[in-house]
From Swiss-Prot:
Predominant cellular place of this UniProt entry's protein: virion
HAMAP family in UniProt: ADV_CAPSP
Induction, as annotated: Expressed in the late phase of the viral replicative cycle.
Miscellaneous comment as given in the Swiss-Prot or TrEMBL entry: All late proteins expressed from the major late promoter are produced by alternative splicing and alternative polyadenylation of the same gene giving rise to non-overlapping ORFs. A leader sequence is present in the N-terminus of all these mRNAs and is recognized by the viral shutoff protein to provide expression although conventional translation via ribosome scanning from the cap has been shut off in the host cell.
InterPro entries: Adeno_Penton_B (IPR002605)
Family per similarity comment: Belongs to the adenoviridae penton family.
Record protein name field: Penton protein
Gene label: L2
Self-association and partners: Interacts with the fiber protein (via N-terminal tail region). Interacts with the capsid vertex protein; this interaction binds the penton base to neighboring peripentonal hexons.
Any single Gene Ontology cellular-component annotation: host cell nucleus
Keywords associated with the record: Capsid protein, Host nucleus, Host-virus interaction, Late protein, T=25 icosahedral capsid protein, Viral attachment to host cell, Viral penetration into host cytoplasm, Virion, Virus endocytosis by host, Virus entry into host cell
Keyword Repressor tagged: no
Function according to Swiss-Prot or TrEMBL: Major capsid protein that self-associates to form penton base pentamers, each in the shape of a pentagon, situated at the 12 vertices of the pseudo T=25 capsid. Involved in virus secondary attachment to host cell after initial attachment by the fiber protein, and in endocytosis of virions. As the virus enters the host cell, penton proteins are shed concomitant with virion acidification in the endosome.
One Pfam family, short name: Adeno_Penton_B
């Protein structure tokens, strides 16, 4: 087929070449009564120039019973023929015809509101695995270890509450398993904390000379006993802790006690033996708490006689060797949303499929026409009296369950941070640009919102879309 090298002749030229006695045959290009290439044709209506927008509504009352009884706000059907006299069944037989001589596009804008909590099984933020002591002999020496899956209840928690729930999950696992097989309380294996245990450390005595660890929060931390480990391979809770892999695309994320070189917690000065009148004498480490729980001082030959066998990720990262845990992980700002990702919009009956996609009835394989961040945002505020509020809650809200070992300087409840984070669902208004539209748009449209794993999201509360059709170009050129 050959195409003309010049534009078609003008109307006057055509009229001059045809005798006036004959009815001239004017090419369709010159017909203006049908609005030409901008025409939009509805069923049973003549072609007309139309500025009607296409509204994608997730909760039309007429659509619910007929179309969406088994759907939700992230995967629904909606009628786009704006006629109150049509039932959804009648609208499904209608269509909107965009002039075939033009290529059409639609400016797509969306409004999305979600009510997602920050700890859910759906987002892999309510559980993690830990390698903890399982059995011990009569003297308390640990014999075997096992992998346990620790789970916390789903909910929307602040940073302080989430830390308490993580530690409570460890304690409940110990009560259900380790305690039943002679494992001692000081060998619980795993603790989440927020303190910097190196503050007050004297390099000469190699002890924390104040006799207590500074009760101030700095950054979420992981404390492990010898032989223990924590696994975040299938969990997002490491994002809440502000601990990420330095190479995030590599498979697996396990932090072992052996990885935390240089992270041994220094022992406290035993204040009962120390005499301030003779500061150079009687400088000995505190070996156990008032309930005879051992601090395991001097049990790690690689650390020295004044260090406990507990190892802290925060200490290993900041004070350990460069080729240690710092080469594998990176300290980042804690994310109370546990690292939510993106969502995808799909309009399979309206937008032209990319050549690499094929039509499907499976929402996980619909062509993607728009993407945006999931609208769950962290909010931070400063509370200088957070530790005071925490102590006040112990007597008013009866939160003693979060402080099972108050006599132990390491296993006690971690102090609340002064910078508190909460998660908030913020409605998002997004402009997705121009989408290529099909020339034949069915009266009932499928609208799907999927997460990063291409799953429909049950936490979508409101999803709206507006598409404004317009001509992009002519199909003849």
């Amino acid at each position: 087929m050959e195409f003309p090298s010049s534009p078609p002749p003008s109307y006057e030229t055509v009229m001059a070449q045809v005798p006036s006695i004959l009815a001239p045959l004017v090419p369709p290009r010159y017909k203006g009564a049908t609005e030409g290439r901008n025409s939009i044709r509805y069923s049973q209506l003549p072609p007309l120039f139309d500025t009607t927008k296409l509204y994608l509504i997730d909760n039309k009352s007429s659509d619910i019973q007929a179309l969406n009884y088994q759907n939700d706000h992230s995967n629904f059907l909606t009628t786009v023929v704006q006629n109150a006299n049509y039932t959804p069944m009648e609208a499904s037989t209608q269509s909107i015809q965009l002039d075939e001589r033009s290529r059409w596009g639609g400016d797509f804008r969306s409004i999305l509101h979600m009510n997602m909590p920050n700890v859910t099984e759906y987002m892999f933020s309510n559980s993690f695995k830990a390698y903890l002591p399982a059995t011990a002999d009569a003297s308390g020496k640990v014999l075997t270890y096992e992998w346990y899956t620790l789970t916390i209840p789903e909910g929307n928690y602040s940073e302080v509450m989430l830390l308490d729930l993580l530690n409570n999950a460890v304690v409940e696992n110990y009560l259900a398993h380790g305690r039943q097989h002679n494992v001692k309380e000081e060998d619980i294996g795993l603790k989440f904390d927020t303190r910097n245990f190196y503050l007050g450390f004297d390099p000469e005595t190699e002890l924390v000379m104040p006799g207590f660890y500074t009760n101030e929060a700095f950054h979420p931390d992981i404390i492990l006993s010898p032989g223990c480990a924590v696994d975040f391979t299938h969990s997002r809770l490491n994002n809440f802790l502000g601990i990420r892999k330095r190479l995030p695309y590599q498979e697996g994320f396990i932090i072992k006690w052996e990885d935390l070189q240089g992270g041994n917690i220094p022992a406290l000065l035993d204040l009962e033996i120390y005499n301030p009148d003779t500061p150079g004498d009687n400088i000995t480490p505190l070996l156990q708490d008032s309930k005879a729980r051992s601090y395991h001082v001097g049990e790690d030959p690689s650390a020295g006689s004044t260090f406990t066998s507990y190892r802290s990720w925060f200490l290993a990262y900041n004070y350990g060797p460069v080729d240690g845990i710092k080469s594998k992980t990176v300290l980042v700002a804690p994310d109370i949303t546990c690292g939510v990702e993106q969502i995808y919009w799909s309009l399979p009956d309206m937008a032209v499929d990319p050549v690499t996609f094929t039509s499907s009835h499976n929402p996980s394989s619909y062509p993607v026409v728009g993407t945006e961040l999931l609208p769950l945002l962290p909010r931070s505020f400063y509370n200088g009296s957070s530790v005071y509020s925490q102590l006040l809650q112990e007597s008013t809200a009866q939160t003693h369950v979060f402080n099972r070992f108050p006599e132990n300087a390491i296993l006690k409840r971690p102090p609340a941070p002064t910078i508190i984070s909460i998660s908030e669902n913020v409605p998002a208004l997004s402009n997705h640009g121009t989408l290529p539209l099909k020339n034949n748009i069915p009266g009932v449209q499928r609208v799907t919102i999927t997460d990063a794993r291409r799953r429909v999201c049950p936490y979508v509360y409101k999803s709206l879309g507006v598409v404004v059709p317009r001509v992009l170009s002519s199909k003849t050129f």
